[in-house]
Amino acid sequence: MKKIKKIMAAIDLSDYTCSVLETAELLAAGLQAELLVTNIINPENIETIKLAEQLEHDYKNFFQAVTADNYLEKIKEERSRQLDAMVEQLGMGHISARKIYRVGVPFEQLIWIVKDEDVDIVVIGPKGKTNLSTVLFGTTAEKVFRHCPVSVLSVREKKSDDLRACMFLESKKGQ
């Protein structure tokens, strides 16, 4: 069996994110492997901002100046802040994880990252934030399972019913 040197935690800031992070960190520590934490930004959100940019021209006083570029930067900053808060709250501040943010179709981008980064195993939650798209298209996790060229570990346990509790309100360590 090939030695696991690089582990990718695919997070979407759903209720499973904290458990995915903890599991990936335990694996990385136990195997002395590099940890990548990935988050994909849905392009539909960017398209909405581009539409708002067009409308801004007609409704200058109604919209603040928002561009797709500064929206993308703000989203990356916010998600990075949320991830840092989760890592700290879970008592994982000692880990060194490289963060990767991409824009695109989530399962496609995750597969590209696996190939580009030579990832050995992917840790992912079984579903994301909503079940609406699942009815029509299937979950990102299902597509990753079908198309991923490496092993995929599905974390079934929710850390919390409320992601905010995991990030900010509950102190897991020190209480």
What is the predicted function of each stretch?
Residues 2, 43-45, 73, 77, ...:
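Structural beta-alpha unit
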Residues 2-65, 160, 170-175:
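Small/aliphatic-rich secondary-structure junction motif
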Residues 38, 98-102, 153:
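General small-molecule cofactor/ligand-binding pocket signal
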Residues 39, 126-127, 156-157:
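Short secondary-structure boundary segments
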Residues 58-78:
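A short acidic, glycine-rich active-site loop
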Residues 121-143, 161-164:
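Glycine-rich, Arg-bearing micro-motifs that act as flexible, cationic patches
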Residues 140, 148-149:
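Short, structured coil segments at secondary-structure junctions
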